[in-house]
Regions:
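The substrate-binding groove and active-site-proximal loops of carbohydrate-active enzymes
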Residues: 53-68, 96-111, 154-172, 222-239, ...
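Aromatic-lined carbohydrate-binding/catalytic grooves of carbohydrate-active enzymes
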Residues: 78-113, 136-156, 182, 198-204, ...
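Aromatic/acidic polysaccharide-binding cleft in carbohydrate-active enzymes
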Residues: 295-362, 384-403, 536-564
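Substrate-binding cleft/loops of secretory-pathway carbohydrate-active enzymes
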Residues: 140, 195-198, 237-295, 316-325, ...
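Aromatic-Pro/Gly-enriched surface loop or interdomain linker
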Residues: 334, 362-439
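A conserved amphipathic helix/loop scaffold
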Residues: 254, 289, 323-330, 338-340, ...
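Mature N-terminal, pre-catalytic/accessory segment of carbohydrate-active enzymes
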Residues: 32-91, 100-102, 106-108, 119, ...
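Active-site-adjacent "subsite" loops/lids of carbohydrate-active enzymes
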Residues: 130-182, 191, 216-230, 241
Length: 677
């Protein structure tokens, strides 16, 4: 009846109009919007495209809300048509950019800007999420007992204690306020896992001793029980995360929760908290490569996921801002994520009064159009197993000296060398691949010096059953000496320049190396120069499969200074084992290949990664590449082959179980779509 009265004003009598007005006012007071009139908003699991705004408000913010108007928000939505907006409410300094009753508000407001954001987004059917700094809170650290204590006994200036009262007295009440008073859809908790630190407060040390029985507390790497101390704090973070989610959802079960970078390549492990989605943001200096790695890991985590691009480039080292990115640059960075089935968002700064820079939205509109053209084809697509690159959970946690630092440079370099050889690669953890190793024709273990014994056995069994295992680096090779048939000589030489002889000679810098002596069944692949012909790598048959290793590391060198020689060496070695990939692409080394499936279609994603995107933070234009020859192995002749989203129908031939397609030109991202019905 209410909807009929509103939609047909001629039917409204004076009494019914009065009654309707009272009801509408009551709804407005109770929830901030008229729920009966609100379009349905997408859950994050179904969302594809968003915009993130934040400004890490501080004590300088004295007129927040002065220029936050409905027209400003309407303009964003009209230009970009996002599924969600994500806006600032509390950054790392700890000041809240809305008039909170439970937190620490900035000094001055003009009205209530958060109610304006919520009212407009609800009316337009756009979800609203909060950017909220979790563990990192400078202001909270000033309060007694709320800061983590450093090894020197001094309070940490940014990281709150996982053993103090911050979570229960501020974080949970404030998220409840956002969920129940402001009716926002969810939260993207920044400064969380990556901001957590070791804590030497009395409550933390008491809990550590009680949990482990260890009385001696390590203060620095190398001291006894250092790893155990780190693991204790990692588990404390997990418990804290589960606790805060449970408490907030008691008040608002539909509230959607994400802890930025938790259960991603920053924290590579099984999802152990009831987060609603996973997310992270790119490296603002080297976005393509950070997206390549993070997206390939997230796609197998079993949760809805997205990644955030930065709309500008900056240096973490000197905080230099290189300026805004072009639409083309962000389109390519989006393509890396979209091609792997993920959602995409872009970060824009808010002004110090909380309003946005309207002039930046037309560029975002161009990026949004590019993404939307690919949404129905790519969103929620899944990889076709080809090469698995291991991001080892125990290997990673034994390697780093922080709780959840992203020190995966070696693995990232190996990934880059493989994808720049046009290999379709996934980045997987043990939990993502155990029990299904046989699905992958090749598994690569990149420079890990520790693996759990059970998983090592699973890898060996995989090879004996017909799989192919490639180990990169002497320390990784040392874990499989009997299987490789190698006797390693002397000690691992520390990182330095290593010369490799293989159809010529090339140098790998920042490389650890170790000589070795092979048994009669192992075949040498290149040699380490100046080492009396000891192998640079080797291959050996083991059962029905093959196992290979390099006796020099190459990930750091390739990550920092990619070279054709290093890439070619690794790809040739991989190709000795992985002889029959589903797809081959020829014509350029500047193309990433992502082999995916979605809705019964085989998708060969091609991404133009040409140019100096590693070293030049701003890409003014992307030069098209091509023509490319794409060969797809398939048992039956396809019913249809198209290029999407362009809609072109290319000529193709099918012979001997192979589809051959020519892509005349690749500007940024195109998909060869193979349909069999």
């Amino acid at each position: 009846m209410m909807l009929q009265l509103i939609c047909n004003p001629r039917r409204i009598t004076s009494n019914s109009f009065y009654f309707a007005t009272l009801v509408l006012l009551g709804l407005a007071v109770a929830g901030g919007t008229v729920s009966a009139q609100e379009p349905v908003r997408l859950k994050r699991a179904d969302s594809f495209l968003g915009i993130h705004f934040d400004f890490h408000a501080g004590k300088d913010c004295t007129n927040v809300g002065a220029h936050t108007t409905p027209a400003m928000i309407e303009n964003i939505i009209n230009l970009v048509h996002p599924d969600y907006l994500q806006i600032d409410c509390k950054g790392h300094p700890g000041w809240s950019s809305y008039p909170t009753k439970v937190g620490h508000p900035v000094p001055g407001f003009v009205g209530d800007p958060l109610r304006v954001w919520r009212s407009v987004t609800a009316k337009r059917g756009v979800a609203l999420y909060m950017h909220y700094s979790g563990v990192a809170d400078d202001h909270a650290c000033q309060l007694p007992g709320w800061a983590a204590i450093n090894a020197d006994g001094q309070p940490n200036q940014r990281a709150t204690s996982l053993f103090g009262s911050y979570t229960d007295r501020l974080l949970i009440p404030q998220l409840r306020e956002l969920a129940t008073v402001y009716k926002v859809d969810g939260v993207w908790v920044d400064g969380d896992c990556w901001a957590a630190v070791r804590d030497y407060s009395e409550p933390a040390l008491k809990a550590f001793r009680a949990a482990t029985g260890i009385q001696s507390v390590p203060r620095k790497p190398g001291e006894p029980y250092w790893f155990e101390f780190l693991e204790f704090h990692r588990d404390a973070f997990r418990k804290n995360l589960r606790h805060e989610i449970a408490e907030v959802k008691k008040a608002s079960p539909a509230f959607q929760f994400c802890s930025n970078w938790s259960f991603t390549d920053h924290m590579p492990e099984p999802v152990s908290a009831p987060v609603d989605f996973l997310s992270g943001d790119f490296d603002p200096e080297n976005s393509v490569n950070s997206a390549r790695f993070a997206a390939r890991y997230l796609v197998r985590q079993g949760k809805p996921w997205d990644l955030m691009d930065w709309s500008f480039a900056m240096s973490w080292k000197d905080k230099k801002n290189y300026g805004p990115k072009t639409a083309e640059q962000m389109q390519r960075e989006a393509a890396v994520v979209v091609a792997l089935g993920g959602g995409f968002q872009v970060y824009f700064k808010q002004k110090r009064d909380g309003s946005i820079y309207d002039e930046q939205m037309p560029v975002m509109a161009e990026v949004a159009k590019f993404c939307r053209e690919r949404q129905s084809l790519c969103h929620h697509s899944e990889p076709v197993p080809q090469i698995a690159l291991l991001l080892s959970t125990p290997g990673h946690y034994r390697k780093i000296d922080s709780l959840f630092g992203r020190n995966n440079h070696e693995a990232n370099g190996v990934l880059q060398a493989l994808v720049e050889s046009q290999q379709s690669v996934e980045v997987v953890g043990e939990h993502q691949i155990t029990g299904r190793l046989s699905q992958y024709p090749l598994i690569v273990v990149p420079e890990w010096d520790y693996l759990d014994l059970q998983f090592k056995k699973e890898l060996t069994d995989y090879v004996r059953a017909g799989g192919n295992l490639l180990l990169v680096g002497p320390k990784t090779a040392a874990l499989f000496k009997p299987e490789l048939g190698v006797e390693l000589l002397g000690k691992v030489k520390p990182a330095g320049s290593v010369r490799i002889v293989k159809e010529g000679e090339f140098t790998v810098r920042k490389s650890e190396s170790q000589g070795g002596r092979l048994d009669a069944q192992s075949v040498s692949f290149g040699t380490l120069a100046g080492t009396n012909q000891t192998p640079a790598a080797s291959i050996k048959s083991l059962g029905r499969g093959k196992i290979a290793a390099t006796y020099f590391s190459l990930g750091l060198d390739y990550r920092d200074a990619p070279s054709f020689a290093v890439r070619n060496f690794l790809n040739e070695l991989a190709s000795q084992m992985f002889t029959n990939p589903i797809v081959r692409v020829e014509g350029s080394a500047d193309v990433d290949v992502c082999l995916m499936r979605n809705k019964g279609k085989l998708l060969v994603n091609l991404i133009n990664t040409s140019g100096q995107h590693r070293t030049e933070p701003i890409t003014k234009s992307i030069v098209p590449i091509g023509p490319l020859t794409v060969s797809i192995r398939q048992a039956v002749k396809p019913a249809k082959v198209t290029l999407q989203p362009s809609g072109e129908v290319p000529k193709f031939d099918y012979a001997a179980g192979v589809i051959n397609v020519t892509v005349p030109q690749l500007k940024i991202h195109e998909v060869v779509v193979v349909e069999n019905k």
